[in-house]
Regions:
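Short, glycine/serine-rich, charged loops/turns that create anion-binding
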Residues: 17, 79, 134
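Accessory alpha-helical/coil subdomains and C-terminal extensions
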Residues: 11, 20-103, 108-109, 191-196
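A generic, well-ordered mixed alpha/beta core segment in the N-terminal half of proteins
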Residues: 1-9
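A structural signal for short, well-ordered beta-strand segments and their strand-loop junctions
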Residues: 9-14, 129
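ATP/nucleoside-binding phosphotransfer catalytic cores, i.e., glycine-rich phosphate-binding loops
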Residues: 108-196
Length: 196
């Protein structure tokens, strides 16, 4: 039975592979692949071949959460997206997951994106920055167009987290708190290998 293989870890078993759940992405007919984290195991001929053997104790007390905030929006930057999108979203969403160009490029046609992003964060809303290149991770400090955002404490850096993992984590976090410091603390806390 699979749950006893890695008792303190959530995983998905498909096509002979055991993958860490927060790192799963749908890629093709084979359904899922693990992004930025190794496969946990494969199963061949009813045999388990383990690749990842770190044992983590199960928490003593299970804590359940009943509150999620579904006001989280994924914004994939494309050349035609205008900064006004932030104004359109502000009445409907509490957080934006910003999928940047490359590993951290944000448009710099003028200062409208900079103003929109800082205005969003300064209004108490949340922005998590990620990439459209999942196997590379996100690093705002690499390109000039991302550097001005890299040191702002209100802009969450997703590093190598998958977009799907960021959505789930932010929905959970924002269901628990609206305090920026607590949001950041929970976001940067590793849960089930969602951050490597």
């Amino acid at each position: 039975m699979l749950p006893t293989i890695f008792p303190a870890m959530s995983a998905l078993y498909l096509t002979e592979k055991l993958l860490p759940e927060p790192a799963d992405v749908n890629r093709s007919f084979d359904a899922f692949d693990s992004m930025n984290f190794p496969e946990l195991a494969i199963i061949r001929d009813s045999r388990i071949i383990r690749y990842y053997t770190e044992e983590r104790p199960a928490p003593q007390d299970l804590k359940s959460y009943a509150s999620l905030n579904d006001r989280v929006f994924v914004l994939k930057l494309t050349p035609e997206v205008k900064a006004e999108i932030f104004d359109l979203l502000s009445g409907h969403y509490d957080a934006i997951i910003l999928e940047t160009f490359g590993i951290g490029g944000i448009p710099e046609y003028d200062d409208s994106f900079e103003k929109a992003i800082f205005s969003w964060v300064d209004s108490g809303k949340t922005i998590a920055v990620t990439t459209q290149v999942p196997e590379e991770g996100c690093d705002l400090g690499v390109y000039q167009v991302g550097k001005k955002f890299s040191n702002h404490k209100g802009i969450l850096k997703s590093d190598d987290m998958t977009t799907e993992s960021i959505v789930a984590k932010l929905m959970w976090i924002l269901g628990q708190t609206d305090k920026p410091d607590e949001i950041a603390r929970l976001f940067y806390r590793e849960i089930n290998h969602d951050r490597v």
